[in-house]
């Protein structure tokens, strides 16, 4: 798959950073010496962590060279490593593992989450936020267009769900705070919705298509978006975007 586009991702930087800040606000840790930012992207979440814990040793981990290049410029005080989050292991146990809008791309959370918990110190915290929007029209319509035009399903798997996450985490010996929030982002047009998802959810669908095929796909996708997302009285469009959060503390 082609590398991520940091500029496109940060086109809606404020909207993407807000859930990161709200996840951070629910972490009840004062003294943090070592922490990981898994799937750190262009460093927007890493900057929040540095502001909260300026004396901590912060390591950002991502598998995108382009994102890491941007992150090193944005937050030069922190260390960044190119690695697969499933295989990366810190040199020693850490106080906090923070993963904002990244783990939804990683398969098999039933194995992944116990592994991540094992990397924490006792009383350490795993804090996670993930888009939970595969059943929203924005993503359902991608699958519909692919089916219409004869392309394979390249959608990511749905998240296991709140009850499954609660069981996975409590069975690994964690105290768990879990919640789900739906944001309503103001979009200026239906094309703006396409611009938003082009940086993330639409990427797998576009990767294997020719330029002509991409244009045909996006033209039909735009037609269906117009049918599903009404224009408000002031000309704006509200894009519903559910996100799932949890903060899990490893109990002694």
Swiss-Prot record:
The keyword Secreted does not apply. InterPro entries: Methyltransf_25, SAM-dependent_MTases_sf, Trans-aconitate_MeTrfase, Trans_acon_MeTrfase_C. Pfam families: Methyltransf_25. Its main location: cytoplasm. GO terms for cellular component: cytoplasm. GO terms for molecular function: trans-aconitate 2-methyltransferase activity. Keywords: Cytoplasm, Methyltransferase, S-adenosyl-L-methionine, Transferase. It is found in: Cytoplasm. It catalyses: trans-aconitate + S-adenosyl-L-methionine = (E)-3-(methoxycarbonyl)pent-2-enedioate + S-adenosyl-L-homocysteine. Its EC number is 2.1.1.144. GO terms for biological process: methylation. The keyword Kinase does not apply. SUPFAM superfamilies: S-adenosyl-L-methionine-dependent methyltransferases. Signal peptide: none annotated. It is an enzyme of class 2 (transferase). Catalyzes the S-adenosylmethionine monomethyl esterification of trans-aconitate. Belongs to the methyltransferase superfamily. Tam family. This is Trans-aconitate 2-methyltransferase. It comes from Enterobacter sp. (strain 638).
């Amino acid at each position: 798959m082609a590398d991520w586009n940091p500029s496109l991702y940060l086109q809606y930087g404020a909207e993407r950073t807000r859930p990161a800040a709200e996840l951070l606000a629910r972490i009840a840790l004062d003294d943090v010496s070592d922490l990981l930012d898994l799937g750190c992207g262009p460093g927007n979440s890493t900057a929040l962590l540095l502001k909260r814990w300026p004396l901590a040793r912060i390591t950002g981990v991502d598998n995108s060279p382009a994102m890491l290049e941007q992150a090193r410029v944005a937050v030069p005080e922190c260390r960044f490593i190119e690695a697969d989050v499933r295989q990366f292991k810190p040199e020693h146990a850490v106080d906090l593992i923070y993963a904002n809008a990244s783990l939804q791309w990683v398969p098999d959370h039933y194995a992944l989450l116990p592994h991540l918990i094992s990397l924490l110190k006792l009383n350490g915290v795993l804090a996670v936020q993930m888009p939970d929007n595969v059943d929203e029209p924005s993503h359902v319509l991608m699958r519909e267009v692919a089916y219409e035009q004869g392309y394979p399903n390249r959608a990511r798997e749905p998240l296991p769900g709140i009850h499954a996450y609660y069981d996975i985490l409590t069975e690994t010996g964690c105290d768990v705070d879990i919640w789900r929030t739906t944001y309503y982002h103001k979009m200026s047009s239906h094309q703006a919705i396409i611009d938003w998802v082009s940086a993330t959810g639409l990427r797998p669908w576009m990767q294997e298509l020719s330029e002509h095929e991409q244009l045909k796909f996006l033209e039909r996708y735009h037609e269906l978006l117009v049918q599903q997302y009404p224009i408000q009285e002031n000309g704006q469009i509200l894009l519903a975007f559910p996100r799932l959060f949890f903060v899990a503390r490893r109990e002694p």
